[in-house]
Every structure is written in structure tokens, then in C-alpha cells.
């Protein structure tokens, strides 16, 4: 139509390959599908356990990642300037964010911001999730936890929460715009 009418178009359309169908759309009765580039962003994340992701999970994960990337992501473990950040979101709204010397302290402080709203939320860490953080995470109902890595001991604790979605997203797979 644009060509037929000799109109100029400022619309640009991109297409992406199908990744998979999601658990559900914005509401449980709606269907949703996921399209994206290989090895970039959430398409490159490794889901370590839990139910299939929903549309809302992806929205919350993207918001959580956007916030956590304000801090250095996946720092060297023994860095003297290692700042651990934790962010909690639910329904695309922040419930808490905090910095601390350890992932567990960062999560505890973020949870203290609004522990009621954090119930059923998404948690993002900028560094490895260790045993102490996993023990705290296991005490609350959460939809997803995303981090650059998880200790083996942390995975053992979190494995008991079968429906909890654990996602590992490596620094090199984060899309930079």
C-alpha cells in the first residue's frame, strides 16, 4: 500500500524466529509465544528448574534485569570492590532493591523494603547466589530467581522448591542496546 500510494513509511518491521510457546499470556486464559534471537538475552538464559515461563514472568524478568544492570553484573568473586545487588519485582513494579557485602544481605535488605509485595515476585542478583542467599530465598514464595550463577549447595536448597523457576543468565549473553 505504501508503494502503491507513493507514500513514505517510517515504519520498520523486524521478524524474529519462534522460540517456544509460553505457559500463558498476560492472563491465564490467553496464549502467548516467544520469538527472539539465538544466544541473546532471555533466549540464552539457562532455565535450571521450574515450570515453563509465562508472558508476565518474561516482563518481570526483563524489568529486574534492567534494574540489576545498574550495578556491575557477574563480578570477579574475589574483587575488593565486589558490590552485591538484589532486586525484587512483582507485576513489573519494584518491591525492593539493595546493595550489600554479600548476596544474602542484599536480598535480606531488598526484602525488608516490602516483604508483602515480594510474595510471588521475581528476584535478580548481579552476582553468584550462594548457600546463605538460597536459604533465605527458600523461605518465601517466589516465581523466578535469575543470577549469573548458583553455587551447587544453593541449587540443592532451591531444588526443593520445584515450581521455582531458576534462570542462569551469563554476562556475555545480555543484549546491549
Identify the residue ranges that each predicted region occupies:
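Active-site loops and adjacent core secondary-structure elements that bind or stabilize anionic groups
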Residues: 1-177
Amino acid at each position: 500500500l505504501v508503494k502503491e500510494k507513493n507514500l513514505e513509511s517510517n515504519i520498520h518491521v523486524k521478524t524474529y524466529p519462534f522460540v517456544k510457546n509460553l505457559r500463558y499470556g498476560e492472563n491465564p486464559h490467553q496464549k502467548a509465544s516467544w520469538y527472539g534471537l539465538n544466544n541473546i538475552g532471555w533466549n540464552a538464559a539457562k532455565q535450571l528448574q521450574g515450570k515453563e515461563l509465562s508472558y508476565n514472568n518474561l516482563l518481570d524478568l526483563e524489568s529486574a534485569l534492567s534494574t540489576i544492570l545498574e550495578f556491575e553484573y557477574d563480578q570477579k568473586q574475589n574483587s575488593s570492590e565486589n558490590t552485591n545487588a538484589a532486586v525484587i519485582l512483582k507485576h513489573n513494579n519494584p518491591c525492593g532493591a539493595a546493595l550489600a557485602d554479600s548476596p544474602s544481605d542484599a536480598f535480606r535488605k531488598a526484602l525488608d523494603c516490602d516483604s508483602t509485595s515480594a510474595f510471588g515476585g521475581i528476584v535478580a542478583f548481579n552476582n553468584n547466589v550462594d548457600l546463605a542467599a538460597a536459604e533465605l530465598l527458600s523461605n518465601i514464595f517466589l516465581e523466578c530467581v535469575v543470577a549469573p550463577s548458583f553455587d551447587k549447595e544453593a541449587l540443592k536448597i532451591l531444588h526443593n522448591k520445584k515450581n521455582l523457576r531458576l534462570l542462569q543468565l551469563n554476562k556475555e549473553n545480555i543484549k546491549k542496546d
